[in-house]
Amino acid sequence: MPLKAELHCHIEGAAAPELVIRQAQKYGKDTAPYIQNGSFVWHDFTSFLAAYDFSAELFRTEEDYARLADHYLTSLARDGAIYSEVFTSPDHATKAGLSPKAYTDALGEGMLRAKAKTGIEGRMIVTGVRHVGVESIERAARFAARCGNPLVTGFGVAGDERVGEMEDYVRAFEIAREAGLGITIHAGELTGWETVQAALDHIRPSRIGHGVRAIENPDLVRRIADEGIVLECCPGSNIALKVFDSFADHPLPALQAAGCKVTLNSDDPPYFWTSLKREYDIAAEHFAMNEKALAAVTRTAIEAAFVDRKTKAALLARLNGAAR
């Protein structure tokens, strides 16, 4: 089993159905409309968001969030992952009645619990949400810059790509960049190549969340390759959300063949009936990646990770040791 690393997963979207059911029992909520036969059920983007929001609202206390992070990273480690970055949302903290700091520190505590048991390293990317608004995104950036938690190492923007313009988020990313945080932004998923180009022009990230619609513009693909931008690809998510009709249509192999740096990620794994392990299995089955190619994908992820040099070197040493 190849060692794995993940750069793109939303922590609220990583809550496994069995954990959500336990949380629902704790708070007296009925999961029947959203979980059936041990799986999340939804039929379009609106119903997906409804299921997601229902589950997210079941995490309300610091211990709830610590349990969530511990549960997810421990499950990743069981599947061979040695590194995990998760997107966190101060907006979810506010909805839960927690301060962003209490929420973040609780998630960090869960990560440390998982590390103590399994050795997995975890980091957080504080994330603003497009459809919540520019002011909220800038608040998230200011929080990320000053929160003081050593596991917060990145800043990003997610949410509905159809809302807002990249120019709107320049100040937020300036705040994050000045604080030394790694920069990533969702683009080129539900919208076309234009959002990827706008992100490169205005935000100047080192990584793009998804970015797969760049395949629609050969000049943009060349630019991504030339600039060494790392794509956080999520094939299982893309098929579940009908960004592409099938894995045979997915552009990851073409992007890689064009010289783009690609990684494998699960996005919101239980909602898309996937996992990081399954993403690696998909790459093996549908993209003809052998063990060496999969190890190279993991290496790309670790090299692009928002983590200090010492930890990165240790992760690469683990990967090199496993490859011998």
UniProtKB/Swiss-Prot annotation:
Catalytic reaction equation(s) = adenine + H2O + H(+) = hypoxanthine + NH4(+)
Superkingdom, according to UniProt?
Bacteria
Q: Which GO terms describe its biological process?
A: adenine catabolic process; hypoxanthine salvage; nucleotide metabolic process
UniProt binding sites for Zn(2+): H8, H10, H186, D267
Instruction: Provide the family line.
Output: Belongs to the metallo-dependent hydrolases superfamily. Adenosine and AMP deaminases family. Adenine deaminase type 2 subfamily.
Q: Does the keyword Transmembrane apply?
A: no
Name the positions where substrate binds. D268
User: What are the site positions for Important for catalytic activity?
Assistant: H210
Disulphide bridges = none
Function summary? Catalyzes the hydrolytic deamination of adenine to hypoxanthine. Plays an important role in the purine salvage pathway and in nitrogen catabolism.
Q: What is the name listed in the Swiss-Prot or TrEMBL entry for this protein?
A: Adenine deaminase
In terms of SUPFAM superfamilies, this protein maps to: Metallo-dependent hydrolases (SSF51556)
What EC number(s) would the UniProt record show?
A: 3.5.4.2
PANTHER family for this protein: ADENINE DEAMINASE (PTHR43114:SF6)
The entry lists its GO molecular-function terms as: adenine deaminase activity; zinc ion binding
Species annotation: Mesorhizobium japonicum (strain LMG 29417 / CECT 9101 / MAFF 303099) (Mesorhizobium loti (strain MAFF 303099))
Under InterPro entries, the record lists: A_deaminase_dom, ADE, Ado/ade_deaminase, Metal_Hydrolase
What are the required cofactors? Zn(2+)
Give the matching Gene3D superfamilies: Metal-dependent hydrolases
